[in-house]
C-alpha cells in the first residue's frame, strides 16, 4: 500500500491518496566477470521499468473526492543500471565500488481526482502529485584492510546526485 498526503497548499490542504497493492511484471538482466586469483569481480545489471495500474482512493478534508469518473492511475517505476566491482590488492587490502543510474525523470504520479482538481482550478496539467526533475546518479568507492581473520577496517566515500525535489 502507498499513502500520500499534502499540507502545503490551500487547494490541496489535507489531500490524501491511497493506492492499494498491485502486482506487475518487470525483468532484470546482468553480466558478471571475475578473475578469482586476483579476487576481481565486476558486474553490470539492468532493471526494467515496471508499469502499474491501480485505482486510487482520494479524499480531501476527510471527504471522498468524486469530481471526475474514476480511472486507473498509471504509475511506471523507473529503469536503472548498476555497475559494481571489487578487487583484492597486495597486503590484505581490498578495493570496491559501484555506480548507479536511475531514470527518475520519467517517474510521475497523477491520480484521476487530483488531475480533476487541477483542471477545475484552471491549472491544467502544470504539475503532478509526485514528479522528479532529473535522473539520479550515485557512486561509492571504498578501501578495506584485513588486520586479522576477525578484524577489518574500511573507509568509504559516497556521492548521490538526488532526483530533484518531488
Regions found by a protein language model. Give the residues of each.
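Outer-membrane beta-barrel porins/channels
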Residues: 1-166
Amino acid at each position: 500500500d502507498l499513502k500520500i498526503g499534502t499540507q502545503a497548499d490551500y487547494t490541496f490542504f489535507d489531500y490524501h491518496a491511497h493506492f492499494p497493492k498491485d502486482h506487475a511484471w518487470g525483468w532484470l538482466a546482468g553480466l558478471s566477470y571475475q578473475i578469482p586469483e586476483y579476487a576481481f569481480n565486476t558486474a553490470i545489471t539492468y532493471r526494467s521499468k515496471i508499469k502499474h495500474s491501480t485505482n486510487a482512493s482520494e479524499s480531501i478534508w476527510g471527504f471522498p473526492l468524486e469530481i471526475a469518473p474514476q480511472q486507473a492511475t498509471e504509475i511506471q517505476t523507473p529503469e536503472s543500471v548498476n555497475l559494481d566491482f571489487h578487487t583484492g590488492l597486495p597486503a590484505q587490502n581490498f578495493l570496491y565500488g559501484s555506480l548507479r543510474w536511475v531514470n527518475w525523470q520519467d517517474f510521475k504520479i497523477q491520480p484521476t481526482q487530483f488531475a480533476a482538481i487541477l483542471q477545475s482550478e484552471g491549472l491544467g496539467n502544470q504539475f503532478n502529485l509526485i514528479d522528479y526533475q532529473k535522473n539520479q546518479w550515485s557512486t561509492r568507492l571504498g578501501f578495506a584492510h584485513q588486520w586479522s581473520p576477525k578484524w577489518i577496517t574500511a573507509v568509504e566515500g559516497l556521492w548521490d546526485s538526488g532526483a530533484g525535489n518531488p
